[in-house]
Amino acid sequence: MCSFCNQNKITGQIYQPTPLEVERILDKAASDLGERTKNAEIAFFGGSFTAIDRTYMLSLLDAAKKFRDKFCGIRISTRPDYIDKEILDILKSYGVTSIELGAQSMSDDVLLANDRGHSAESVFKSSQLIKSYGFSLGLQMMTGLYKSDIQKDLYTAETFVKINPDTVRIYPTVIMKDTKLAELYLNGEYTPYSLEKSVNLCSRLIELFEKNNIKIIRLGLHYSDSLVNNSYGDNYHPAFKELCENKLFYDKFIEKAKDFLDLNEIKTVVINSKSLSKFLGQKRSNVKKLNELGYDFSVCFDDTLQKYELYLK
């Protein structure tokens, strides 16, 4: 098992659903969502889908296939070393549309230290195979793993860009109890990134992926009582993505301000109207920090700007 993995406590789920339960869940979802199902996917997450018992996997796909025409697709998450042509032929025949790979890192030494059981090369090969079959490809990475560092995390993200997935998920490492990582932490052999360090890094990753038109569909773990009650450290934050977006806008402002000889020349910040809360920061934290530095400005909108774009005038 991976050094960091305790899926039951991460997801709060301690049982495997039966095919009948899957059908009931999907039937209720289709009823509740109505026309909105056309924008909703059926998703199998919380483990390595193609690594589970084959008969059980096929029974779940059978259940999902009955509802395939009511939803926009079927998405699964799995390991890069459990992808081959036979598996992809099966997934294609059942209407699966998106496959996400838990790559976690593209540094072999980090993968080895965390007992991942696969190499960076297997991520490359499985990604290419998935794309050749016409599936949407998603890649998942973890920052701050045991034996990783900022440069290795940036290398993973930059390598993802070369692979060119459709989507990415970024998960800052959270130390779950009853894992190898927890033992290393308690023995003083592993020090997790601080929340500030994680935010600084992941704000850079947002910009990198956005610049390369790769959609970030998750940044940080979903909140659950089980997650909070069964983890160590204080680097988890339920609004982690928002903190990263706030940091990204703050850094962009400071960088753009360097073009002005006098900070008093800056009268207006121009952003997309949908990005207002991201720019202002939680409890207007960005504005307060900038005011403390001597900046005094108003905000106006230009909705032709990209989500994370701004300029000063």
Positions of predicted regions on the chain:
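Short acidic/His/Gly/Ser-rich catalytic and metal-binding motifs that mark active-site loops
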Residues: 1-2, 176-183, 227-229
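Local cysteine-cluster metal-coordination motifs and their immediate loop/turn environment
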Residues: 1-9
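Conserved non-cysteine loop/helix-boundary elements of the Radical SAM core domain that shape
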Residues: 10-24, 46-170, 177-197
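Short Fe-S-cluster ligation motifs
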Residues: 25-48
